[in-house]
Amino acid sequence: MGDVEKGKKVFVQKCSQCHTVEKGGKHKTGPNLHGLFGRKTGQAEGFSYTDANKNKGIVWDEDTLMVYLENPKKYIPGTKMIFAGIKKKGERQDLIAYLKQSTSS
């Protein structure tokens, strides 16, 4: 499991320009991530997803996020997420630990 505080820094640096995490947070370029764990791809209410995201049909958890965050366009070809990914496994683990805490409270 990753370090939540380090993960928060990763989120602020690499994700917060497009995403929010708090309950009731607004969608930006990317969807609000509250309730992410256990939700299927392309299901955040009120966000306009590509068909690729809606049709991927996986459920977000630690394992699916580890693969997705390494290379989003490889995992979901056709996603509109313009992000190259996080190559360092430790950074992904930290980010996922932060997301698990921040998107469920």
From Swiss-Prot:
Quick one: a GO biological-process term for this protein? mitochondrial electron transport, ubiquinol to cytochrome c
Q: How is it modified after translation?
A: Binds 1 heme c group covalently per subunit.
Q: Where does heme c bind?
A: 15, 18-19, 81
The keyword Chaperone is assigned to this record: no
Give residue numbers for the modification (N-acetylglycine): 2
Write down any Gene Ontology CC term.
mitochondrial intermembrane space
Tell me which UniProt keywords the record has, alphabetically: Acetylation, Electron transport, Heme, Iron, Metal-binding, Mitochondrion, Respiratory chain, Transport
State the Gene3D superfamilies in the record. Cytochrome c-like domain
Molecular functions per Gene Ontology: electron transfer activity; heme binding; metal ion binding
Q: Where in the cell is it found?
A: Mitochondrion intermembrane space
Please tell me whether the keyword Transcription is annotated for this protein: no
**Which superkingdom?**
Eukaryota
Q: Its function?
A: Electron carrier protein. The oxidized form of the cytochrome c heme group can accept an electron from the heme group of the cytochrome c1 subunit of cytochrome reductase. Cytochrome c then transfers this electron to the cytochrome oxidase complex, the final protein carrier in the mitochondrial electron-transport chain.
Q: Which family does it belong to?
A: Belongs to the cytochrome c family.
Q: What is this protein called?
A: Cytochrome c, testis-specific
Gene (name only) = cyct
